[in-house]
Amino acid sequence: MKRLILMLIVGAMLFALLSCSGKNNAPDGKTYTDNYVYTMWKTSDTSTYTLYRINVLSATGTPVCPDPLCGHDTNECPFYGINTEGSGIVGSGIYYLRGSVPMQHCRQVCRFDLESGKLAILYENSAATIAKLFVFDDYVYFLELVGDGKESPTYTFRLMRYGIHDGKTADLGNTGAAKNTDIYACVDGRLYWEDHDSASCFSTDTDGRNRVDGDRLSDRTRSGNYSVMIENVQPADREYINMYTCNVVSKDLTTGETQTIIRNNPSFPMVYDGKVFYYRFQEEPLLIGYIVDEESNERKQIFDARGTKLYICDFDGQNDRLLCDIAGSGYLFGITNSMLWSSGNGEYYCTTLISYRQSEDGQTVERGNNAIVVINIKTGSYKIADME
């Protein structure tokens, strides 16, 4: 089983819901709409991930990089070394971090213009690491890790701000933030921060000052009069390839009452366009292969708990229904949180599909090919994307 886990688990799962926005307000007040959703992807003939956009009408995915000859593996590519954490689209611009090492040691804050195909480096500091990015309608904030220059340096996080409207960068100084601190909202002239390790929270003004400890928005993930949260995260049975289950709880923002709307969800749900996307634990689990237990040398069956069905409901648990079933496609649903952004068309959602195969020696189950599926969230119709 240890061997199976090492082969199948890549990266770490965030203990949070992912929320996306279907509209993007340009600095000139216009809305940039191009019927695309965005995700990171690599084709079978390369080892390099790059940013793709998928046309939701044709289900065709192409690299966002405008150079058809680019291998996406050098600094000449605008998305080489991209760190998508905290990135976002405002108007026709994608705002993201970039560095010499992909997903690490970011030195640049960048904007890629989807209309012109041009990259602009908004801020660069070769002597510091940019650790966090937070994109809002008016400002892009980022935390810069800076040493004090001593032989045994002490590092602090300096808050920086780039104005989307005026193009000016401001050094807001040391606000006492740490690497595990996020700015999760900018509302009515206040920044709302949350420290994930200590579960503490506070707010500041948009200059990072006038701190109020304990101040938080009532709920971070909401739609209408309801918000949703995750509770009771539990490890799944060893017979399942899925590693955990959780309950999804709905909260009435007027009364404060909560109710569990989804139980035993074998993945963290996706929150998008006022809906909750989730899987149901399979009553008849899908057999995906066999493993040989390293301790007992016994050959055992291994199952997938997510299966081929994706469900959808409102934040209050109403209008709960099967959205689509991809049985017969040759794939199973993977983790729901794979779509980065939607630029203009909120009727579509994309996520990763996965497959499994028995290893050549018959000792374990391996991951097969992946795919991207584009789903119409109103009709449930779907297409497997052709990723060029």
Model-found features: residue ranges?
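Repeated scaffold domains used in trafficking and secretory/extracellular systems
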Residues: 24-32, 73-89, 127-137, 177-188, ...
